[in-house]
Amino acid sequence: LDGTAYSSASPVYYAGTDQDEEAQTSSTAVNLGDQLQIRLDAQGHPSKVVIDPELMWPVANLGAGGFTVNGVAVRVNSNAATGPVTYYTGLNDFSSRQDGMQVEVHGAYGQSADGKGYIQATRIEQLPASNPVTRLTGVVSNLNAANGSFQIGATVVQTQASTLITPSG
């Protein structure tokens, strides 16, 4: 991973489901382009690997170089010379996506020259149309601690006492 070799046999693997944030899975669940969180033990060996998408929700605002998910811009790329290539699961390519299609987006957070955040997609997976899970990643803006709200991209999030924000802090 990023130039460091790790044994894939030692850690326990987890992935989100439509019922749980993290459910145990096998190492074969890791796909090319997936974003991973790797937790190391005291000896520097992986003990836990979490397959961790950046966004989950329907596609909106399809354009030539991307789309939005939950108000967060997603950029796609097919040219290895200009950055990470976007891979697709359950889709043939960029043109097979449609507004309203449920997707899971893996990638890296970036900022444009004008300071707007986006996800540079490394993998996009089509999800079932009835997917109940929403996942949102980005920079928090318009934080209002008094009423428990904040904004990521164009999405306003209203928290409650039972809201879990990870990572905490």
State each model region's role.
Residues L1-G169:
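Short, flexible, surface-exposed loop segments at domain boundaries
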